[in-house]
């Protein structure tokens, strides 16, 4: 799978997007200067016809690899309260923290 990496720097930190080259999937990570060592996974999306083919898992592995290479030890995310979405993150090793405002806060130490 060919991936495109897009980096942005902001006053508060930076973002990294990993995009599948055909545009069918994307994951976005945010790194805030105020929280060194922590990544916030701010979005993961795979278009419906491409789901259940392992693409999301590959993007998550790319995200985790990037984090390890850059001194990040924890990834946080907020998951919608949909069983299959939460099941996916749990299979990837993410641990639920608490439900808040219609989302499940989750994390993984890497």
Where are these regions (language model features)?
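Conserved acetyl-CoA binding element of GNAT-fold acetyltransferases
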Residues: 37-48, 104
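Acetyl-CoA-dependent GNAT
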Residues: 1-38, 42, 99
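Conserved GNAT acetyl-CoA-binding A-motif
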Residues: 60, 67-80
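Conserved beta-strand-loop-alpha-helix junction that forms the acyl-donor binding cleft
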Residues: 76-86, 102-103
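Conserved acetyl-CoA-binding loop-helix of GNAT-fold acetyltransferases
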Residues: 46, 52-65, 91
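Conserved acetyl-CoA-binding loop of GNAT-fold acetyltransferases
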Residues: 90-99
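A general lysine-centric signal
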Residues: 108-109
């Amino acid at each position: 799978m060919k991936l495109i990496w897009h980096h942005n720097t902001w006053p508060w930190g930076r973002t990294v997007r990993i995009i599948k080259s055909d545009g069918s999937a994307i994951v976005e990570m945010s790194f805030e200067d105020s929280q060194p060592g922590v990544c916030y996974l701010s979005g993961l999306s795979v278009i419906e016809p491409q789901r259940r083919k392992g693409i999301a898992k590959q993007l998550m592995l790319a995200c985790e690899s990037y984090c390890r290479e850059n001194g990040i030890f924890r990834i946080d995310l907020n998951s919608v309260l949909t069983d299959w979405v939460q099941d996916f993150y749990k299979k990837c090793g993410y641990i639920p923290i608490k439900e808040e405002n219609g989302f499940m806060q989750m994390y993984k130490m890497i």
